[in-house]
């Protein structure tokens, strides 16, 4: 009995020695000492310690807690900034926009939003079992305030997947098209900004601008594009204004996830050209538009250009996170959010052919395209100087309601 007990002790001692000398025990001990040391260090020293720690030790810390800590700290910082802004607003002080630095934009763009958006697109196409449809759609309706009484089909069981639910049609009487005004809202959404375009800079929100040429792309020299020839000394804005006495106007409409996701023709016009810019898929909510300069120029977008009765007219659908899919009903060659693309590239397609020398005629209110989720519509158009917007920044608007008129 004593001999057996002695052998057990020897075996335990030997196993303990082997464990202590094993790589796992060394890593465990190193990690434990590393974490213990971190608890006694101030924040700056902790960051320095993390940067100088062995790779194997950092791997054993597990990435999830590190990401949660980093993300939580950054979210807390952003919440503090928002709190400070609210306090300044209460005092009646105008808050200048605090733009993201170059490294913050680069860090955000490093997030694989295109891959995540493609994954979400695939997930949205998965057919849901009948028993799961009502709870899933009801949760979405409750979260984003969707008004299903406007839907052509109110029965949630009718929608086989999330994609069909996002692209649901409305009852004809739900969105009457205003016939008295020359330009109507192409979609449901929130008005971010509007007004005249000056010095080839366009406001994405108040105080934050983007380059008109970067957004629409360089003026092409082909005859079928709706850009008139201009001398090199003219600004890009002046190249778009085709008639004497006219001005260039813009309007930005943000579509939230709970909004109706289709967009329509805002006026009677002819679409002669499409330009597709592959790009990032960063969020385009008003907070991000206030934070990142030229956000719309970074993101994937589809620019439709043409003419209306007063000259140049364009509608741009801007993609966003989980909104990599932009569909134009009459453009079957358009494929957005492709796995690979060249930075700064764009694809042109002319709708002017020998058989159709004018382009695609669109009537006011006619269906034009759709998103898979909320995003942004940007209108840039030429009109006489007495064109007046009937809007307020920040107001909610529905498809068919008036944007402005002469």
UniProtKB/Swiss-Prot annotation:
Keywords: Cytoplasm, Decarboxylase, Lipid biosynthesis, Lipid droplet, Lipid metabolism, Lyase, Membrane, Mitochondrion, Mitochondrion inner membrane, Phospholipid biosynthesis, Phospholipid metabolism, Pyruvate, Transit peptide, Transmembrane, Transmembrane helix, Zymogen
Cofactor(s) the protein requires to work: pyruvate
Mitochondrial intermembrane topological domain residue ranges: 80-406
Quaternary context: Heterodimer of a large membrane-associated beta subunit and a small pyruvoyl-containing alpha subunit.
Mitochondrial matrix domain ranges by topology: 50-60
Record's signal peptide: none
The protein, known as: Phosphatidylserine decarboxylase proenzyme, mitochondrial
Span of the transit peptide along the chain: 1-49
Organism from which the protein derives: Rattus norvegicus
Note on cofactor: Binds 1 pyruvoyl group covalently per subunit.
One GO cellular component term noted in the UniProt record for this chain: lipid droplet
Biological or metabolic pathway of the protein: Phospholipid metabolism; phosphatidylethanolamine biosynthesis
Main location: mitochondrion
Reaction catalysis annotation: a 1,2-diacyl-sn-glycero-3-phospho-L-serine + H(+) = a 1,2-diacyl-sn-glycero-3-phosphoethanolamine + CO2
